[in-house]
Amino acid sequence: MNYVPLYIKTHNSLLSSLINEDDLINYAKKNNFTSLTITDNNMYGVLDFYYLCKKNDIKPIIGLELQIEDKKIVLYCKDYIGYQNLIYLSTKMSENSINLDLIKEKCANLICIVPFESNEMYSKLENIYTDIFQGYSSSEERKKLEGNNLIYINEVLYFDKNDFNYLKYLESIKTGNVVNSFEFDKKRNYMPDFDYIQNEFREDLKNNKYIYDNCNLELKLNQQLLPVYECPNSLDSYTYLKKICVEGLRKVFGDKVNVIYKDRLKYELEVINKMGFCNYFLVVWDYVKYAKENNILVGPGRGSAAGSLVSYLLNITTVDPIKYNLLFERFLNPERVTMPDIDIDFEYTRREEVVSYCIQKYGLKKVAPIITFGTFGAKQAIRDVGRAMNISLKSIDYLCGLIDSRLTLKENYNNNKRIQEYLNINQNFKHLFKIASKLEGLKRHTSIHAAGIVMSCVDLDQVIPLDRGHNDFYTTGYSMEYLEQLGLLKMDFLALRNLTLIKEVLKELPGFDFDNIPNNDFKAINIFASANTSGIFQFESDGMRRFLKDLKLNSPIIGISAIFIKQQLNIG
């Protein structure tokens, strides 16, 4: 059988590997791998890896490097139950709360390999895991082990042995040390010679095959995981939503409600109920209501959600969609099943209060901000490697000043003679540029999405890994592009500086109600016509101001933003 490495770390083990998912897949295809593993010290890259493998007809084997009692072990999931256990353990690892009792509790459907350097853990784990193997990475190590459960396992951090030097710079950036000031023993952490492995350790390859054959993860997609609002008096979500909307209709229009509004409300509620989104609307209604009751300024509504009469009657939006001929189908269409998307603007300084409210109401593990990843951009790579090389800040600043951030370092070099001339001044500068080019694009750090929040009816660590971090909240361990596929709904809580500015202005104007500003105030219209719109949301860009001048506006401004966006899309 063909050997496939079982201990591969990618750049998702931040600042510890030179391997990205795309290159790993290409390497696997070039070497005719039918299966492939990922074993980072977190699960950040699992979904990228899983979907890339599936797309390229490669069987994905999902693993996790776990640290217990200062020793590393590697776990692989056999199926979805094992995957859920990996998720849970990954979350606990972010809490620094891994122990043997927890390992014993979450051992089902997992395969364990204990690397040679952690061999003292083997006796503590052999009665926990049904499938457990003793790992080695050389003939010398193998001679010191006994049993028929031996397996070759070499931690892979880069493809070619000549790439070791690049990894050393990555380690330098991680630790903050100058590159030649520390020992770094990772010279053997490259892809092994497969022919050598197959000849030297042939008798143990049956154990590799066992892992390849028994790890068969199929992710569960499109689960029903929307958050659930607890309705009073044991009402179901549809009945309660309808009750609030009918009350809203009477509040806005009194007893004489136009039949157009009645019919539209009936239609929207039927669609919302049929698509299973009643709870979603109640959850949004609840946190918007909380914000308004606590004097947190909320925007009037944006995007396609403004086309929903239900949103209007729930006071989620403040624009009457029938009055302005806005289409509900742009928001929710029974012919096109997609998740609803209501973006809510909160004043910049108080957004976190609304997030905290949701966490307290629904549960710490049912609400989580969404993780994002920062990568080495061209200038960032130059600065980080320059510091590792102890090159003067003046020289680094000058070189960064020559770099166009829209281009890669290679493109910058090929298109800029001044960069070429500067690098020729000093061999260290050439070396800096070469190292930085190798690191460019690798993941560097994690951050939090500016607006995105995930909410669920189940603890999120049953579905995705979580990271314990910011303000003791959890963040998702997966980025937002995959969450909807798993059945999780992203909600946007946008922090808008303009709302904070309006709040401050309102303090100077007691009794003023900006919701009742007339649409035909021609003094205000003239301000827009003259493009004197600095600081006005969506009207302050250079392009919009030029558009306003060309338009020679003399009527209410409704629709201008939409026309401008459409024009920009057509130009693009």
What feature does the model see in each segment?
Residues 1-572:
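Alpha-helical scaffold/interaction cores of sigma-54-like transcription cofactors
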